[in-house]
From Swiss-Prot:
GO terms for biological process: endoplasmic reticulum inheritance; mRNA transport. InterPro entries: AH/BAR_dom_sf, She3. RNA-binding protein that binds specific mRNAs including the ASH1 mRNA, coding for a repressor of the HO endonuclease. Part of the mRNA localization machinery that restricts accumulation of certain proteins to the bud and in the daughter cell. Required for the delivery of cortical endoplasmic reticulum into the emerging bud. Residues 293-304, 320-332, 347-380, 391-401 have a biased composition (Low complexity). Residues 101-260 form a coiled coil. It is found in: Endoplasmic reticulum membrane. One of its GO terms (cellular component) is endoplasmic reticulum membrane. Keywords: Coiled coil, Endoplasmic reticulum, Membrane, mRNA transport, RNA-binding, Transport. Residues 410-423 have a biased composition (Polar residues). Residues 284-423 are annotated as: Disordered. Its main location: endoplasmic reticulum. This is SWI5-dependent HO expression protein 3. The keyword Ribonucleoprotein does not apply.
Length: 423
């Protein structure tokens, strides 16, 4: 054999072909059967030629050695293939186990992460529980203190309750006694009230006729008095109207400007007399009449010395001249007082002036008509003193008549035995 063939076979021996274990086992079974039977394909052709016997035998020896080597290698290969197959199975199992373990490892990693999160959550819960425990411990301590305080207060309240119970029992007993006492008093008052009602009914029954008769008589007297009062009121109105007409008529006949001129002259004469004789005038005279003023206008004097018509008495001499009036005013039997001027308020007393009646022909009257003063004009409408005196006399007569009527009615009621009190 050449070296190439040996190298080729050695290469084939060094790197056997990859065969499946099933095919190797089938060829290996046939080869092993031929080897056991002593069958060799080269031995059949050895008889053909004697010259190449040695070469053939050498080749047969090599073939046998190679066959043996092949057989050993086949056995070894078979063993290796079986081992490879078992290794492949083991590897596949290991791969499966590795994948399973990887999956389990992933699962365990996820579980570990979940457990770690759970641990962190539990740690937070533990911290919260610790905080809650501390708060609960503080609350428990506070509650214990409050419990002790409440126990002490409960004891105090129990003592107070016992005291109040004793006081309440005493009040109930006192109320019961008072109730019994007041029930008896109420019963007595009811009996007294019933007796009083019965006596009052008897009294009213006895005196009802007297009350009715007195009421009838009283109503009759009231009606009579109303009629008399109406008649008296109508008469009074008529009298006042008549007086008003008379006063207006007398005031229309009076010359006010002449009386003002007389007043100015008399006042100036009194002041001149006091200056000539050095006799001081009274302060009341000066306060009422003032100083000497001959240049006063009639309008000013009339406004400042306005006299009510009822305060002036006109002299009885009619149609006389101013000289006659002046002579009668300055007569020897007439004195000029300082404080009796018409229309001016009179003082109480004057030490330097005589207390005569006033100016001649003028007399004060107590009856004053307020309604007639509003109807006077600035031309000097003043009433006469005679009308004022007549009105005063008429008013006094009416008042006297009214008094007589009242006295007669009062005496009549007394004579009849009628009274306004209880019968």
């Amino acid at each position: 054999m050449s070296n190439q063939e040996v190298d080729f076979q050695a290469a084939h021996l060094e790197s056997p072909m990859k065969m499946s274990p099933s095919k190797v086992s089938m060829n290996h079974g046939a080869f092993m059967a031929n080897m056991q039977n002593g069958y060799s394909p080269t031995r059949e052709g050895a008889t053909a030629g004697s010259s190449s016997t040695r070469v053939i035998e050498a080749l047969h020896a090599q073939i046998d050695s190679l066959t043996k080597t092949n057989l050993d290698l086949t056995v070894q290969s078979n063993n290796l293939l079986s081992r490879l197959e078992s290794s492949n199975n083991t590897q596949s199992k290991h791969l499966e186990s590795i994948s399973t373990l990887k999956h389990e490892n992933d699962n365990l990693g996820l579980m570990l992460s979940r457990k770690e999160r759970r641990v962190r959550d539990l740690e937070q819960q533990l911290s919260q529980l610790k905080h809650s425990y501390e708060e609960a411990a503080m609350d428990n301590k506070t509650m214990r203190h409050q419990l002790q305080t409440s126990g002490q207060r409960e004891g105090t309240l129990e003592n107070q309750l016992q005291q109040l119970q004793v006081q309440y029992d005493a009040l109930v007993d006192g109320q019961k006694r008072y109730r019994e006492k007041y029930d008896l008093e109420v019963e007595e008052l009811k009996k007294s009230l019933q007796d009083f009602k019965r006596d009052n009914e008897m009294y009213l029954t006895k005196n009802i006729q007297t009350v009715v008769s007195n009421n009838t008589a009283l109503q009759t007297k009231i009606n009579q008095y109303s009629g008399k009062y109406k008649n008296l009121e109508s008469l009074s109105q008529q009298h006042m109207q008549e007086l008003s007409r008379e006063v207006e008529g007398m005031a229309s006949k009076l010359d006010l400007a002449k009386w003002e001129k007389l007043y100015e002259e008399s006042r100036n004469m009194a002041i001149e007399y006091s200056e000539k004789t050095n006799v001081p005038l009274s302060p009341s005279f000066l306060a009422q009449h003032g100083a000497k003023s001959g240049s006063r206008s009639p309008s000013t004097s009339s406004s400042s010395t306005f006299v009510h018509p009822s305060q002036i008495r006109v002299p009885k001499v009619r149609h006389s001249s101013s000289s006659a009036k002046r002579s009668s005013f300055y007569g020897s039997n007439v004195s000029v007082p300082g404080g009796t001027v018409p229309g001016v308020k009179q003082p109480s007393a004057s030490p330097t002036t005589p207390s005569s009646g006033g100016l001649p022909g003028v007399r004060r009257s107590s009856s004053v008509r307020g309604s007639s003063s509003s109807s006077r004009n600035s031309s000097g409408d003043l009433a006469s003193a005679e009308s004022a005196a007549q009105s005063q006399k008429g008013a006094s007569k009416n008042s006297a008549n009214n008094k007589k009527k009242r006295m007669s009615s009062h005496s009549y009621s007394k004579s009849n035995g009628f009274s306004f009190g209880e019968p």
